[in-house]
Swiss-Prot record:
Domain of life: Eukaryota
The protein's enzyme class: oxidoreductase
Gene name as annotated: nsrD
Protein name: Anthrone oxygenase nsrD
Any one of the GO CC terms: membrane
């Protein structure tokens, strides 16, 4: 196996880890919050902290994963290999979660942050509905790096067969 094969595998693992980490927030953490928090402002505080830590780690991992896919694609293209384009598609698919966030998720995020900043007490039911909506949108966002990992894995398998 070549160095690029190891780097390709690293990109696939990184994208899979990113998707799994993101998915675990919607599949595990949000249900835990909903089951154990019975106060609207407290649920908003917990969601805001979850968002804070996620916004520190997840974008960095997304950029790193795209960078690794990009490195592999450029290496393949320089070597005149036809396997460069699947890695570009994997990078683009992984990065596509960013415009999805801007165009689809920001209104819900802004509403949750607005409620969090307000001094008045917020009804638990209102917050729960918004947090559940956010969780489902986050599931969809988590699929972008998963699809990128799938594309990268397919390219890696093709690479190993040649």
């Amino acid at each position: 196996m070549t160095k690029e094969t190891y780097v390709s595998a690293t990109a696939v693992v990184s994208g899979s880890f990113l998707s799994g980490s993101m998915m675990s927030l919607s599949a595990l953490v949000i249900p835990l919050f909903l089951d154990t928090i019975d106060d609207g402002p407290q649920l908003l505080r917990q969601w805001a902290r979850l968002y804070h830590y996620g916004s520190i780690y997840m974008p960095a991992l997304c950029v790193a994963t795209c960078g690794i896919y990009g490195y592999v694609a450029l290496s393949k293209r320089a070597a005149i290999s036809p396997l460069w384009s699947p890695y570009v598609l994997a990078a683009v698919s992984t990065l596509a979660m960013v415009p999805f966030t801007w165009w689809v998720m920001v209104p819900t995020n802004n509403t949750l942050f607005g409620l969090h900043r307000s001094a008045e007490s917020t009804e638990l039911g209102v917050v729960q509905v918004l947090v559940v909506k956010w969780a489902w949108l986050h599931v969809v966002r988590s699929l972008y790096p998963l699809f990128g990992a799938f594309l990268g894995f397919r390219a890696l398998i093709r690479e190993l067969r040649t």
